[in-house]
Amino acid sequence: MKIAVDVMGGDRAPDEILKGALLASKELESEIVLVGPREIVENAGLSFVETTEVVNMDDPPLEVLRKKDSSMHVGLKLVAEGKVDAFVSAGATGPLFLGATSIVGKIKGVERPALGVAVPSLKGFTVLIDAGANAKVRPEHLLDFSLMGIAYARVLGVESPRVGLLNIGSEENKGHEDLRKAFSLLKEHLGDNFYGNVEGHDINLGTVHVVVTDGFSGNVALKTMEGTAKLITSVMKESIKEGGLFSLIGAFLMKKSFDRMRERLDPRTYGGTFILGIRGIVVKAHGSSDAKAIRHAIRVAERGIRMNLVREIERGIPHVRNSGDGR
């Protein structure tokens, strides 16, 4: 397995990206292929592909197609040509998403690819889709998202994933017209796999395995979770310091438990987001990713390769297309 890494993507590129790639190369079986300027990548001790251009974080999406020798464009092309099995980038979402759909290409039957991420819940994880790619969607897009989310959850070991539609209430008649139409579509096509409407708190409670929503709401939910996780760890640290000697002793005795909790809540450990619905494995890392986050994103990419994520989505989409939904 080969995983290409965009050395120039992200707010902390190239240093943190290189560190993360090196960490991953020591832990994973996959060969890591760095994509970036020769002067930056040639002495890292890993395979590399030289590029001369950069898609900047504030570049408009079309720049990924114009800058054909950028690390992002070249990395996506490596996936499209089968020269690597996956590509990881912390670059800007807009260019990466457009590049993935245009260069790697969409799976037949998928109109709108989406960002899917597994976030921690009380029952293990919840797949959130769309996590930020499509701000406005139609009801049929949410059906596609649910099918891709089911495939992702199966890859993660859930035999019969249950799907919830993110809404402002659990009742069937809640939300605007498009959400009510989406509810009917999911109920018709998913059958027993459709749980119904869920609310924001259900994401981390693990009420369902897959939460489907538009990219605007999904991204707000994801960023809120990230902020809440940071708040919890910060408040705990402050409370321990303010509690005096006995609090410090108690914290020392519970250090392993606290470390496990902090690791589980750390946004860097679930920051690798698949672009689902394309004909290859592309993982979007957070723009502010440090080495730990990049290492995890590469690990996510390897998991997608091992579990044949693309094939699972390809298997899940056609049966709905042929079931008379009229599209």
Curated annotation (Swiss-Prot):
GO terms for biological process: fatty acid biosynthetic process; phospholipid biosynthetic process. InterPro entries: FA_synthesis, Phospholipid_synth_PlsX-like. Gene3D superfamilies: Isopropylmalate Dehydrogenase. Homodimer. Probably interacts with PlsY. The keyword Cytoplasm applies. It catalyses: a fatty acyl-[ACP] + phosphate = an acyl phosphate + holo-[ACP]. Belongs to the PlsX family. This is Phosphate acyltransferase. The keyword Lipid metabolism applies. Pathway: Lipid metabolism; phospholipid metabolism. NCBIfam families: plsX. Catalyzes the reversible formation of acyl-phosphate (acyl-PO(4)) from acyl-[acyl-carrier-protein] (acyl-ACP). This enzyme utilizes acyl-ACP as fatty acyl donor, but not acyl-CoA. It is found in: Cytoplasm.
